[in-house]
Design a protein with these regions (language model features):
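Hydrophobic/aromatic beta-strand elements that line small-molecule binding cavities or substrate pockets
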Residues: 88, 151-159, 184-192
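Short, low-complexity, polar/charged sequence segments that are solvent-exposed and flexible
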Residues: 106-109, 155-158, 190-191, 218-222
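Short, highly charged C-terminal tails/helix-capping segments
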Residues: 232-242
Length: 242
């Protein structure tokens, strides 16, 4: 991130801060003495038990504020964007298998996939595949409240991050609000390297978004994509045997 490495200890510190924040935001009790990993695992179970409707009901006022703030930021930003970019290296999988596993988790609306998508980052309140879209409810960076938006895959209107042909697998899509307002987008690109894979993940925000949000979202990307990649490594048989 910004040509600087971010180690496991720093990621753990970030996760602990943010997982506790989500517990509080959802009005859930937690064990202060539990490890960060335990807190994250229990939070995932609690989110699953609550279900989509109950979670949205708890944070509906925050989502309305998020919607308003994104509309204002988008209108005042025009076509200008800021980018949160994080590069990740991993061993134990190749791009071909990773792509198929990620497609499986992203496009198939199953109970297992919903749980996986909640588990990879404590800031995920909901990630729900809906035909050609992925509904996302998450806290982006250190924003004051969670946001709701929809990623329309394989559409690139307004995406400013160019495709790099050296990365054979990509996830690209526009991010829009419920009313269709385009607020940004994603272009995540992946390739095989000598020892595993290299992932360059990028999210585009309206330019008016504070730098602090964009910078913190780089860590969010590191956490969630490390989680997805590790899950893919552990579940390669999903596609190898199909």
């Amino acid at each position: 991130m910004n040509e600087k490495s971010f180690d496991a200890k720093a990621l753990e510190k970030w996760k602990r801060k943010h997982v506790i924040s989500v517990y509080k935001n959802l009005g859930l009790s937690y064990d202060w003495e539990a490890s960060t990993e335990q807190l994250c695992e229990v939070l995932t179970e609690k989110k699953v038990d609550l279900g989509y409707d109950a979670i949205v009901a708890k944070i509906q006022n925050q989502l309305k504020l998020g919607d308003i703030s994104l509309k204002i930021a988008t209108k005042l930003s025009g076509k200008r964007r800021k980018k949160a970019t994080t590069k990740i290296y991993a061993e134990g999988i190749d791009v071909e298998i990773l792509g198929r596993v990620i497609d499986h988790v992203t496009y198939l609306n199953t109970a297992e996939n919903l749980k996986v998508n909640l588990s990879v980052c404590p800031e995920h309140y909901a990630l729900v595949p809906r035909e050609e879209e992925l509904e996302v409810i998450e806290k982006t960076g250190n924003a004051p409240f969670p946001m709701q938006f929809f990623i329309r895959f394989n559409e690139e209107e307004g995406i400013q991050t160019p495709r790099d042909e050296e990365y054979p697998y990509q996830i690209v899509g526009i991010a829009k609000l419920k009313d269709g307002t385009i607020i940004g987008g994603v272009r995540h690109q992946f390739r095989n390297v000598e020892q595993g894979i290299e992932a360059v993940t990028c999210v585009e925000f309206p330019a008016l978004c504070p730098n602090s949000i964009v910078k913190d979202h780089q860590i969010h990307l590191a956490v969630e994509w490390s989680g997805w990649i590790q899950w893919a490594i552990d579940h390669q048989d999903l596609v190898q045997n199909s």
